[in-house]
Each structure stands twice: as C-alpha cells, then as structure tokens.
C-alpha cells in the first residue's frame, strides 16, 4: 500500500521510520512484543526489559493517540494473562497513566479509542485472547486483513507502527493484517 497524503512527505519512496512521518494528533496502532517472564507463584515480572525497550517509541509518539497491542504467552500456559499488569508497569516506567482496556476490538475498545485525545495511550487486552489471533478460529494468512480485529481497529486508526520484531515471524492479524488497510511504519 502506498502511503500518501498528510502523514508523510510526498517524496518518500523508501521504508519509513518514525522520523519520516507526521503522526502528531493521529491515532496510531502500536504492536509490541512485551511477552515477559512472570513469577508463576504471583505473576510478578521477573524481567521487564521488553517493556523498557518500547519507551523510546512511546516517547516519539507522545503527541499521538497510541493504542498499544501486545500478547503475553499462549492460552493454556501458566503465564498466559491479561495485559493489566503490563499496562500498570509500563505506566510507572514512562511516568504517564496508560488506560488498560479489557477488550481487543469490541465495543469497549472502540469507545476507548474514540474518546482519546492527543497524548493519550490505551493498552488493549492480550491479543491472543481473540479467537482470530490464536486458537481454533485463527484466520489464515490470506484472510488477516479482513479479520474482525483488523477491520474494526483500522477503521479508527491512521497508522500502524510495529516494534513486535520478536514475534514478526508469526502470521497473525495484529502482526501482518494491517498492511493492506492503513499506512504501516
């Protein structure tokens, strides 16, 4: 998908970085890999380096409306959990309140995104809780752009940014499905 219009300068024809685009005031879907080791006895973080690794990008997007998407483990595993703890830790690390939304692309998530103002950040729930992302109803690679997750979230977003390189080898809607729908950086 060619990126045109006010997001980027007209002469940009190469791979884009955040330095190349103007995202201030825009709604950005931000896919991260914050899958972290958790203490099995209490769910506490044993290492939060993956959360720390996204602080720079979050600061770069400080004038945007940032919708954070991530996962923690897989269904059935002892460390599979919602993203509330990740949201809390990330809020403390960045020194800004990030709103946890216990939803991925349903009405609660859509309302939270629509109510955002520039500078706000929301952290959606574990994307692997959505059946199209992981599990029996996981969509095929060729159908990811028409999945519910991509269709709904791309309708309220201006761009997609990924720092989920640790999971980039996987086919799932939140990793590869947005490429045909909205500008991806």
Segments predicted by a language model, with ranges:
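Active-site loop-to-helix "anion-binding N-cap" substructures in soluble metabolic enzymes
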Residues: 2-185
